[in-house]
């Protein structure tokens, strides 16, 4: 499951605002509505593998489950109406205010506690984070983003120990970041079924594992394939056969450069 946690800093927690002025009296709830759309909508459908968590003023949590939500439409006004109902209905315990939308009083720390309980992996989106192309996404990622404002000092303190990634030096809208993250995750899922290509050949599994460990440090997954020339087959029994390091096609150039910088010139066929 993918999750996107968006912190809204100005939306009235009471839900008392007019749908005719989303950027104004609604505290830029239009930013949250666009984030919901980017996270959940695909052409003619909903991403059922995605959950959106909106945290309003560190006080109210709204969860929207892609596999359960109903009556969600692409326009911001109708999405704002759903969020308004959630804000008005939020209580100490979780309440389903519309199908697939659950609201409750909660703080950022409580949101993180829930993520850990369901074995999600929180990751902060930040302009000064590590480059995303050097990051290996874990299973069940939960990306934490801010709205049109920077994280507050209190937010930063709560998120201080979490990994941070950046999508580049240019500041992007929250919804744009979500679209890019979906693309990267979709691409990675496609790569799981793609053919791996030969990156390097070494003699002996211990050395191969040193190299694959280095590649993993750079966010490049790899597989090992043992290969023995028939006349040398007994050597495989002692772990001394030829071992091939296989990577995804899109990682090949960078992986070979890393091996060349830290070990030796890569050997291919």
State the predicted function of each range.
Residues 191-269:
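Acidic/polar low-complexity segments and flexible, solvent-exposed patches
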Residues 104-107, 125-133, 141-151:
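Long, charge-patterned amphipathic alpha-helical coiled-coil/hairpin "stalk" segments used as oligomerization
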Residues 122, 164, 222:
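Hydrophobic anchor at the start of a short beta-strand
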Residues 153-191:
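Structured adenosyl-cofactor binding patch, chiefly the S-adenosyl-L-methionine
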Residues 150-158, 228-233:
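Short, glycine/polar-rich helix-capping loops at beta-to-alpha or helix-loop-helix junctions
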Residues 116, 160, 216:
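Anion (oxyanion) recognition and catalysis
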Residues 1-126:
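RNA substrate-binding interface of SAM-dependent RNA methyltransferases
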């Amino acid at each position: 499951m993918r999750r996107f946690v968006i912190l809204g800093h100005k939306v009235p927690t009471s839900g008392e605002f007019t749908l005719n002025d989303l950027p104004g009296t609604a505290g830029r709830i239009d930013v949250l509505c666009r984030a919901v759309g980017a996270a959940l909508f695909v052409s003619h459908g909903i991403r059922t593998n995605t959950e959106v968590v909106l945290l309003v003023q560190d006080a109210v949590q709204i969860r929207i489950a892609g596999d359960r939500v109903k009556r969600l439409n692409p326009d911001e006004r109708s999405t704002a109406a759903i969020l308004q109902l959630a804000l008005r209905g939020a209580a100490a315990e979780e309440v389903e205010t519309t199908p697939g939308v659950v609201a409750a009083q909660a703080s950022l720390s409580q949101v993180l506690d829930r993520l850990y309980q369901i074995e999600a992996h929180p990751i902060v989106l930040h302009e000064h984070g590590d480059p995303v192309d050097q990051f290996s996404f874990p299973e069940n990622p939960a990306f934490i983003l801010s709205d049109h404002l920077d994280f507050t000092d209190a937010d930063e303190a709560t998120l201080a120990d979490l990994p941070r990634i950046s999508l580049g030096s240019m500041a992007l809208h929250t919804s744009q970041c979500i679209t890019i993250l979906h693309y990267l995750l979709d691409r990675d899922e496609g790569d799981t079924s793609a053919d791996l290509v030969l990156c390097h050949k070494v003699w002996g599994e211990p050395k191969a594992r040193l190299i694959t460990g280095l590649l993993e440090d750079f966010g490049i997954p790899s597989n090992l394939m043992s290969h023995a020339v028939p006349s040398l087959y007994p050597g495989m029994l002692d772990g001394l056969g030829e071992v091939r390091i296989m990577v995804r096609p899109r990682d090949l150039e960078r992986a070979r450069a890393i091996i060349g910088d830290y070990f030796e010139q890569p050997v291919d066929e």
